Amino acid sequence: MAEPLLRKTFSRLRGREKLPRKKSDAKDRGRPAQRSEPKPPEPEPRVLEGSQAGAEVPLSPETPRSPARGAYLQSLEPSSRRWVLGGAKPPEEISLGPRTPSSGEPAGEIWYNPIPEEDPRPPAPEPVGSQLASSEPEGPILQGAAPTSPPTKTSRTKSPGPARRLSMKMKKLPELRRRLSLRSTRTSRERERTAPAGSVISRYHLDSSVATPGQASVAGGTRSPRGGYLSDGDSPERPGGPPSPTAFRPYEVGPSARAPPAALWGRLSLHLYGLGGLRPTPGATPRDLCCLLQVDGVARARTGPLRSGPDFLRLDHTFHLELEAARLLRALVLAWDPGVRRHRPCAQGTVLLPTIFRGCQAQQLAVRLEPQGLLYAKLTLSEQQEAPATVEPRVFGLPLQLLVEREQSPGQVPLIIRKCVGQIECRGLRVVGLYRLCGSAAVKKELRDAFEQDSAAVCLSEDVYPDINVITGILKDYLRELPTPLITQPLYQVVLEAMAQGHPSRASLGPEGTRGLLSCLPDVERATLTLLLDHLRLVSSFHTHNRMTPQNLAVCFGPVLLPARQTPSRTRLRGSGPGVSSAVDFKRHIEVLHYLLQSWPDTRRPSETPDVAPYLRPKRQPPLHLPLDGPEVVTRPRGRGGPESPPSNRYAGDWSVCGGDLLPRGRDFLSGPDYDHVTGSDSEEDEDESGEPRGTTDFEDEFDAPFNPHLNLKDFDALILDLERELSKQINVCL
């Protein structure tokens, strides 16, 4: 399998000397093989200095062929036999593994096998007379310009240059690299024991096996016990233990240190080596510890439960954290508290990320923990990114005057406010908890980006944004992020003075008087606030449906429309802290907005709906007149033949007996909608406070919306109760 590669290798090593050797071998094959007696080795003649470069040295008598050649050739395959006959190598020269040079050939000749196909076999036994002293020089020795070896017997010992070049080319073959790396350790040791010290194979294995430099261990400073040579494709051995504590730089952040203004983007690789200095209480049982990593206060990684040791806890954990505008890295050591059955922090340390990576990408730190302990860790910053360029705001956070001039919106009101208010008034006035419930954060982020790109192209239809709470949340976010609040300091003072005069009354102030409070505002702010107050007044008029009274709306929009601190200093409590003053501010905000909503004219109140379906109006039943002149006869209901229907079956029976006065459209009414489409309503509004049934006009006042084709089951329940009450009464029957 490896014959073509072996031939190519030998052809490169021999070069142009192959042809003369073949000719000499052809002459030798014509002579009869003679058995020669073993002779003692003769000293190799040397060439003296000053002799001519082309002078030849007398050759020793030719060595006859061995009789084992024929048996050896018969045992080979045809292809191997042709290759051996072509090279004219005697069987004594063909052996696997290293061998010592025999008589009649140079001392440095080797059998070079660049691809170890099989495990090496022990070398074949050689005649005793062919052994040479190990003190003889290996390879040709040059003195001046004259070679010491005879020219007729060409030496096959080559310098490591061609072998190294071949080795570098063979690195591209992954299969050979794998096989060589698997066999290098075992075969190198065997060659080191069997081959002489001066053998070329013992020094080079494809000329790329270099002895590994001694790596001092961390603990004792001794060499790694695993020795030998590394073949192509091998990597250096991994250190056996963690670095010594002296390799870590002490790091400590003061208690008054603040987060740096700069931020960090990229990927942080954090390797934890151990915890030291955690001195447990004498006599205490070992605790279960874990390490929690936080980036800017957000938990990002956590180790499993670890059993604490006497003084040092060895760790081997690696975490890869994606950083986005990161500033602080905090490591918390948590200990299990069996009393409360949860982990409690027992030590913590902080690292300022932007400062430790100045001029380098990796740091080995011994982070000081408070109140005690050290955390040994290696921090590596890879794939560092530049801070994203700040995008100029186009809608959110932009002054109202600038936004209106850019959009050229009619009425001097931004488009985002007009679109949101229009959608809320169209389909959200009857939603319970309007402006109190929050929508999806992801959908709000998507809608915010759409407004930032192009406010005119945003569509807020129900098909695109079915959740009305997303639109209300976007509107409140926009008002909250305005550089200047809509209710400015001058308007705030005006409203406080109006509140000091007495309870707000629309009759006392009048429509123009209430709107006149906004005259101190600029044109854009006055138009925007007027639109918002009209909208909030309309929302509060539907408080029976959405539960949003003026007080609830003031709680939601007070901190949004007013700045954080506008309470005059004289109203603040003396000696009060910032928490008390902020609570007073929040209360004042609610009172100011509540006053404005109560005194604001309700010009957009929905008109009443006079045309209500006649079959939905409750009609007064005429009194029942019965002749009572005869004697009184008490009757009791007779039992029915079959089992009575359960009381839960409310809707069984024939409704036609009710007559046309009660339900003039009873048949069409009952055959129309299905009960599955019936919606519920509040039962507390069925009767007045006095307990008397409502009149027709009172019932019609409730319908301030278009006719709803859905039915009300509670009206049927009330009707059934009235019928059961009438049927259960005892009546006098005249006989």
Swiss-Prot record:
A GO molecular-function annotation: GTPase regulator activity
Biased composition (Basic and acidic residues): 14-47, 669-679
Role this protein plays: GTPase activator for the Rho-type GTPases. As a GCM1 downstream effector, it is involved in placental development and positively regulates trophoblast cells migration. It regulates cytoskeletal remodeling by controlling the activity of Rho GTPases including RHOA, CDC42 and RAC1.
Family annotation (InterPro entries): C2_dom, Rho-GAP_regulator, Rho_GTPase_activation_prot, RhoGAP_dom
Compositional bias annotation for Low complexity: 151-160
Species this protein is from: Rattus norvegicus
Rho-GAP domain boundaries: 398-604
Tagged with keyword Transmembrane helix: no
Modified residues (Phosphoserine): S224, S231, S235, S244, S681, S683
Maturation and modification: Palmitoylated. Probably palmitoylated by ZDHHC3 and ZDHHC7.
The protein's name in its UniProt record: Rho GTPase-activating protein SYDE1
